[in-house]
């Protein structure tokens, strides 16, 4: 289907609306003017007919002359006097332009009729005349030629006015629509450039229209977000590829070692297999964490949300952790108030264990971890504190980025992929919470989770 341009549609619609509106308005004006003018013509004819009647009452018929009759007539009028036997007695007019033969039907028509003769309309008024010395009637013939010419002129003026107004409207619409669509054309061209060249360029528009400027600003913001998302996706792929490449290279190296020496040396075979299995487990864990970040149902928290009793869940997890890490001291300071939150139970367990696991990894010396809960201004607050190496201030804004690790060598030796805190932050945000961090080098770190 062929699509029309917005500018052309705008011009056509506005022009047609203007033309129809003006034309209808002119027709209404002409209708009232016609009625007013017609009534004026009828009044003139009635006045002349009445003057003729008064003339016959003012003097005897024998004393009435054509000059007397003409004095009672207006322009473009003719008078014919008949006696009671329909015999014509007088016929005269002020000029020779009105010469209408009313015909025999004048004996039977009503007082006022309209007749067309040789392309001209006439009003004919029949007026009875009864005096002491005369009995008959008069026919006043009033030409409507002037009236018809005025009406025709009004129609021509209305049409001309409509055409002129339409041309002016079309011109204004063309200029205005060009100004309106120019930013849209620039926007379209910019999209084509971005599709071809990438996100380097931004839309630079400065118009007098707030809506267009808002559209341009929204487009630039959207492009910035898309560019940021694209860069994040590219960085994510690069980081994921890097994280997968290292264990795969290690596995490949040990498989080559097994192929070369492992067949004859059981010690080499055992060591290479153990390392390969360890690296394979690392890959499996990395893939699981990546799936956790990207799986489609992570945003649907309402369908499986349940009431989670925060203190009970923490006590249960701490009990298990004490069995798993007997060399660590886990202290709790849980509020006596009932803390509840609506979320998926496994998500709360997951984010809690992420922070505990992070504390364990970076507190290998003091091995003391404290968990505290409290209720403040209807906010449920969970604080997890370790006494480890701490996080430098310049790194604190980036620790929730995917694959970001403060000490890459230490994290790798401890099995970290740099995804745990990203997953925890995402879970917290999906459930309407927030997270804060407070850390000092060689003194420890406190993560504050707020729901």
UniProtKB/Swiss-Prot annotation:
Residue limits of the HAMP domain? Answer: 178-231
**Segments traversing the membrane:** 11-31, 156-176
Q: Which SMART domains match?
A: HATPase_c (SM00387), HisKA (SM00388)
Q: Which UniProt keywords apply?
A: ATP-binding, Cell membrane, Kinase, Membrane, Nucleotide-binding, Phosphoprotein, Transferase, Transmembrane, Transmembrane helix, Two-component regulatory system, Virulence
SUPFAM superfamilies of this UniProt entry? ATPase domain of HSP90 chaperone/DNA topoisomerase II/histidine kinase, HAMP domain-like, Homodimeric domain of signal transducing histidine kinase
PTM annotation, UniProt: Autophosphorylated.
State the compartments where it is located.
Cell membrane
**Catalysed reaction(s)?**
ATP + protein L-histidine = ADP + protein N-phospho-L-histidine
The protein's superkingdom reads Bacteria
Q: Where is the Histidine kinase domain?
A: 239-451
Q: What is its EC number?
A: 2.7.13.3
Cellular component, GO, one term: plasma membrane
Using the record's annotations, give every residue carrying the modification Phosphohistidine.
Answer: 242
In what way does this protein cross or attach to the membrane? Multi-pass membrane protein
Question: One GO molecular-function annotation for this sequence?
Answer: phosphorelay sensor kinase activity
Protein name in UniProt: Signal transduction histidine-protein kinase ArlS
What's the source species for this entry?
Staphylococcus aureus (strain MRSA252)
Q: What is the lineage of its organism?
A: Bacteria, Bacillati, Bacillota, Bacilli, Bacillales
